[in-house]
Amino acid sequence: MVCRNVSRQQFRAIMIITSLLDTDLYKFSMMQVVLHHFPAAQVEYRYKCRTPGINLRPYLDEIRAEVHELCQLRFTSEELDYLRGLRFIKSDFVDFLGLFHLPERCIFIGEGEQPGEISITVKGPWLHTILFEIPVLAIVNEVYFRNTRRNPDWEEGRKRLQSKMNLVLDDPALADFRVAEYGTRRRFSKVWHEEIVSTMKARMGVHFAGTSNVLLAMRHGVLPLGTMGHEYLQACQALGPRLRDSQVFALEVWAKEYRGDLGIALSDVYGMDAFLRDFDMYFCKLFDGARHDSGDPFVWGERLLEHYRANRADPRAKTLVFSDSLTFPRAIELARQFAGRCKVSFGIGTNLTNDLGHEPLQIVMKMVRCNGQPVAKVSDAPEKTMCDDPAYLAYLRQVFQLPPA
């Protein structure tokens, strides 16, 4: 499916989410852990738009209608067979997905407190609500842009994409450069998203590592990519034995589930200092690498390589994954910085799937509670910290020896 074949009427009329696979792989890898280890956990997610001045209220009914259709979807036999073929997916999980649908009773969509703001809350069993986040954000994005950008400049988007790819293709020194597409949640539209993936596959060859989107990976025969997200480590604040040990608990449960597979640890739920304190020699040797998602990526990478050396793990055998607001020029800088010192991989999201010449929305949907207890993400970028309980956030900072906000 490519954008040149889609009329304006089709662009507006196509149902946005038509498959439950139209989400990121890490949702399934986390969901499998939830099924096997935390099936009774109750959670709450909350939507937030970080872009000022955005008025989404005129589109509330449209968003509700799309979410209603999302909740009617079931996995098809073809989709279940595809998931069953992934080496780390277990048969009982696929059997569960065969019975699964998103429960409409668990999502609440209304007006927000500020002018133009909307409110989206998801509340219910973690196992049954974990798949809401990505498609709901994709729906909000596409509804907004199909109403405010009625004649998308596809050609401008194609020119921008080609210029990005040329930065890699025209430089022989970047023969080992690998980039993945990570842009489902903030994409301009699903048809544009698919064109991005098909174009990168066709033109970038071995430089294109794959996509986080499971549906597009299945359709285009590319590798689906992803391991764990912030919500997993956040939930473990409430599910583990005590708060101070929650990061270690999360990594140990992950290792117990995947036995060395899907071995990229997320480093920024409590900041890099706290991550390195917990990421001891055992984890350094057990996990394949770590993912950067906030703070200075160059400083982060240097600190992680030094940490590996201090723990007698060869950095050259480890993978550093960079995914924080990446652009191609920044990814190339990082590739040059760490060339020959470790393996590097890059996940680029919004800069690929929503770069047609206008400002993309900065929207998120984060877990705020688990089993009735507040949970928080305290990243290396202060603006990404999200928690609805200031007292809990202050306590968490004290427990993990983090500086005050």
From Swiss-Prot:
Could you say which enzyme class this protein belongs to?
A: ligase
Where Phosphohistidine occurs, the residues are: 230
Recorded catalytic reaction(s): these are: nicotinate + 5-phospho-alpha-D-ribose 1-diphosphate + ATP + H2O = nicotinate beta-D-ribonucleotide + ADP + phosphate + diphosphate
Pfam families (UniProt xref)? NAPRTase, NAPRTase_N
Check the record and name the InterPro entries matching this protein.
N/Namide_PRibTrfase (IPR041525), NAPRTase_N (IPR040727), Nic_PRibTrfase (IPR006406), Nic_PRibTrfase-Fam (IPR007229), Nicotinate_pribotase-like_C (IPR036068)
- Protein keywords: Ligase, Phosphoprotein, Pyridine nucleotide biosynthesis
Q: How is this chain modified after translation?
A: Transiently phosphorylated on a His residue during the reaction cycle. Phosphorylation strongly increases the affinity for substrates and increases the rate of nicotinate D-ribonucleotide production. Dephosphorylation regenerates the low-affinity form of the enzyme, leading to product release.
Q: Which CDD domains does this UniProt record tie to the protein?
A: PncB_like (cd01401)
Q: Which GO terms describe its molecular function?
A: nicotinate phosphoribosyltransferase activity
| Enzyme Commission numbers on file | 6.3.4.21
In the UniProt record, which is one GO cellular component term? Answer: cytosol
* UniProt pathway annotation: Cofactor biosynthesis; NAD(+) biosynthesis; nicotinate D-ribonucleotide from nicotinate: step 1/1
User: What Gene Ontology terms for biological process does this UniProt record contain?
Assistant: NAD biosynthetic process via the salvage pathway
> What SUPFAM superfamilies does the database record attribute to this sequence?
Nicotinate/Quinolinate PRTase C-terminal domain-like, Nicotinate/Quinolinate PRTase N-terminal domain-like
What exactly does this protein do?
Answer: Catalyzes the synthesis of beta-nicotinate D-ribonucleotide from nicotinate and 5-phospho-D-ribose 1-phosphate at the expense of ATP.
| Family, per entry | Belongs to the NAPRTase family.
Protein name as annotated: Nicotinate phosphoribosyltransferase
State the taxonomy lineage: Bacteria, Pseudomonadati, Pseudomonadota, Betaproteobacteria, Burkholderiales
